[in-house]
Amino acid sequence: MIQMGTLPPGSPVPSENEIIEQFQVSNTTARKALHELEKEGWVTRVKGKGTFVKDQTVVRAINRIFGFTKNMVEAGRKPATKLTGFHLHNADHQQTVNGHEFTLKGPYCEIERIRYADGVPLMKEMRYISLGLCPDIHRKNLEQSLYGIFAKDYGIHLTEINQMVSAVVLDGAQLKHFNLEKPVPAFRVEGVSFCGRNLIIEMEDSIYRGDMYRFAAKAVR
């Protein structure tokens, strides 16, 4: 009902007892159902009041240069990051974005992170960062904002981002990163970031939960 929009954001969710009575299930099943809805970010519990449908949708403006952390703060959400892996590479990294092939000169650092909002995983990101421009970045706290690290530790500010957004389905091994059991729609974002004319600082290949994200763009004539 929540996914279909029958219960809009802010609507009260049936209590455990109401679920038991309506669907003729056990206490354990009803409790587990509510727990799963909360874990997946669909509902939120308010002490003394009950459980309500959560407005989990985040809007990301793709014509602005700003990161996940700022996006979540502006949306009134609490951001968090978990570093799940990194590797160092000496070779170049190539990526095709919007029909153009770009090359990130080696050596570079490859990192994998899960990004959370209010404790719910919204994005799995892969980043490929130039070690020539950001030496020893793998020794930094990579659970912080990368844009903040670029600016504070290296004096680097992004000047341009070229991105491509495509529709995919979260399934298989990807589901565990989002604490999900069933396939859901998602967005794949591939991008290349510049910090000067033709100077590539990083590349991205990330997956966003499609049921919790909207992408917005503004064009002026």
Model-derived features with residue positions:
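Extended, compositionally biased flexible segments
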Residues: K39, R45, A61, F66-E74, ...
